[in-house]
Amino acid sequence: MIKFEKVNYTYQPNSPFASRALFDIDLEVKKGSYTALIGHTGSGKSTLLQHLNGLLQPTEGKVTVGDIVVSSTSKQKEIKPVRKKVGVVFQFPESQLFEETVLKDVAFGPQNFGIPKEKAEKIAAEKLEMVGLADEFWEKSPFELSGGQMRRVAIAGILAMEPEVLVLDEPTAGLDPKARIEMMQLFESIHQSGQTVVLVTHLMDDVADYADYVYLLEKGHIISCGTPSDVFQEVDFLKAHELGVPKATHFADQLQKTGAVAFEKLPITRAELVTLLTSLSVNSGGEN
């Protein structure tokens, strides 16, 4: 689906202000996967994200998206199709809304790619239903809606382009806890429908709950990758790099360090923690 091979990126190369942001990145996003990218501010994850849909081109190495190869020598006309294959929901996407009605805003993207108005509005209606926005809102101005509803409109606008990969850049930033949970459940539902998803986040619990593969970035390098269940076992390594772990993993690790219990494998979700503690309680009771 998407493959990075020895990708390096330098801002303002061949100048006194040259600044290298990515170092020999090898990364793969498989079709149908839910891949997470984790890192602090300055880790390179935003630069990497912009390579996913061709907003940036590698200084060295190559990025393959489907059958399109992007390198330092690629022309813009060669890269443009990548932007239809990979849809990016940037932070606070509602700031990009501009049309007079919700339906028109969502239909704008498909029309911009040459789809007739009637068909574009049909696609828009399907995507608005997908994101859970009732038709009573479709003829309203997007600016009459709540923040969470506006974000759903913006996400529907990206989905209306029917991308093969949906990239989410800190998608719950600024939302209250209830809206945040609803938003993550929405993305999981979209993923379950067959959509390939890439999540850029600093929230480890979201990675544990939803992702099936994760890459950790630090200062432009991938320092760890694997399934969340494997990566989050390295609690001390992550702490040394000032990266957190899911709350359930932290609790289990602290409990294990007291000597009260030994886990074969640390849980990464609340559900796993409850199951393990219940099992230990039952076994302990059986011994008594």
Curated annotation (Swiss-Prot):
Its EC number is 7.-.-.-. It is found in: Cell membrane. Keywords: ATP-binding, Cell membrane, Membrane, Nucleotide-binding, Translocase, Transport. Residues 2-244 form the ABC transporter domain. The active site is at E170 (proton acceptor). It is a peripheral membrane protein. Its main location: membrane. CDD domains: ABC_cobalt_CbiO_domain1. GO terms for molecular function: ATP binding; ATP hydrolysis activity; ATPase-coupled transmembrane transporter activity. InterPro entries: AAA+_ATPase (IPR003593), ABC_transporter-like_ATP-bd (IPR003439), ABC_transporter-like_CS (IPR017871), ABC_transpr_CbiO/EcfA_su (IPR015856), ECF_ABC_transporter_ATP-bd (IPR050095), EcfA2 (IPR030946), P-loop_NTPase (IPR027417). One of its GO terms (biological process) is cobalt ion transport. It comes from the Bacteria. ATP binds at G39, H40, T41, G42, S43, G44, K45, S46. GO terms for cellular component: ATP-binding cassette (ABC) transporter complex; plasma membrane. ATP-binding (A) component of a common energy-coupling factor (ECF) ABC-transporter complex. Unlike classic ABC transporters this ECF transporter provides the energy necessary to transport a number of different substrates. In this organism these probably include biotin, thiamine precursor, niacin, pantothenic acid, queuosine precursor, riboflavin and thiamine. Uptake of niacin or riboflavin into proteosomes containing EcfA1A2T and Niax or RibU has been demonstrated. Uptake requires hydrolyzable Mg-ATP and is substrate-specific; NiaX-containing proteosomes did not transport riboflavin. Forms a stable energy-coupling factor (ECF) transporter complex composed of 2 membrane-embedded substrate-binding proteins (S component), 2 ATP-binding proteins (A component) and 2 transmembrane proteins (T component). In L.lactis forms a stable complex with EcfA' and EcfT and substrate-binding components. In E.coli forms a stable complex with EcfA, EcfT and individually with 3 tested substrate-binding components (BioY, NiaX and ThiT) with a stoichiometry of 1.1:1:1. Belongs to the ABC transporter superfamily. Energy-coupling factor EcfA family. PANTHER family: ENERGY-COUPLING FACTOR TRANSPORTER ATP-BINDING PROTEIN ECFA2, HEAVY METAL TRANSPORTER. This is Energy-coupling factor transporter ATP-binding protein EcfA2. It comes from Lactococcus lactis subsp. cremoris (strain MG1363). The lineage of its organism: Bacteria, Bacillati, Bacillota, Bacilli, Lactobacillales. The gene is ecfA2.
